Amino acid sequence: FFADLIDELKKAERYIFIEFFIVEPCQILDKLLQILSKKAKEGVDVRILFDSIGSVALSSAMESDYFKSFGIQSKIWLKFIPVFNTGLNNRDHRKIISIDGKVSYTGGVNITDEYANIYSKRFAYWKDAGIKITGPASRTFTLMFLEMWNVQNKKDVPCENFENFIPKEAQLCLENHTGKGKAGLVIPYGDDAYNGADIGENVYRYILQNATKNVSIMTPYVIIDGSMMDTLIFAASRGVNVELIVPQYYDHFISFCVGRTYIKNLIENGVKVYAYQSGFIHSKVFIADNKMGTVGSINLDYRSFYHHFECGTFLYRTKSIKEAQKDFDKTKLECKEITVENYKKIPWYVRTTGWIFRIFGPLM
């Protein structure tokens, strides 16, 4: 992911827009800054937007001075104020890189050495998923970034004209598009924490409801409401082979324990769940029938569905679907199935903690 990203950053001519939940001082950030600084000197418009909670390691002083010293504009999403407010839960969990409106990236990756498998105190390997989008579809990620960037403007600063950032060839493609041909579909989408549309959840639900043979899912968390639980179980009851890969080891203990209680409900009702043994799995991937799916930043939990700003890419009959399925199948070889019988062997304190804190599931 990062090697390909670095190659594309070097080709940027007009702008580089970067939006992440977690950005922290690290080796991979240093590598990126070397390139971004050079591009900024060449006149490329370089901007970074990051979340104040996820990127707590970047202080406000670094936000205003550190990136500025590299010629990079930066903004913090919802600066953290240590008092209760209703917006505290609405974090910018998106992962977006848009280069000239022609190449974009999204997925589960953040900008830390752990995600790049350079260094980790906790896990032998960090398994994640990202996707590269080229062509007219990339413009959507440009627009998503600009929306979030301009929301952070001061009241006296007017909103930018977004059309100025859409490549002319993309505009031409839109005007001449006939809807004909055998090419697959690539549809980027964003989920807004404020509008109640729950797009991320509905994309997952659409895939489950329209699958006829199999659904392959990779997710780090499983903390879901009754409606999503019913959708997963109903797909299995229709004869669809529904398989989930989840972590064997936790990054957040309480979320891990609570997630295991939901997994119990799933495996008791025909959904197959596998625990990844080789490290930590952070991928957010849904694939159905080897023909449709999605890759993005959206976890299978309440926070991603209802509280966070998220993004992803819906795919239909594209080459990347088959590649994602192959990756799932390969990853499953490094897993152990969680059956009803071996669920009982989960330590009592994990199961007890899960049931105690499950009441707080809607906040997780």
Q: What is the meaning of each model-derived region?
A:
Residues 1-364:
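Charged, low-complexity intrinsically disordered terminal segments
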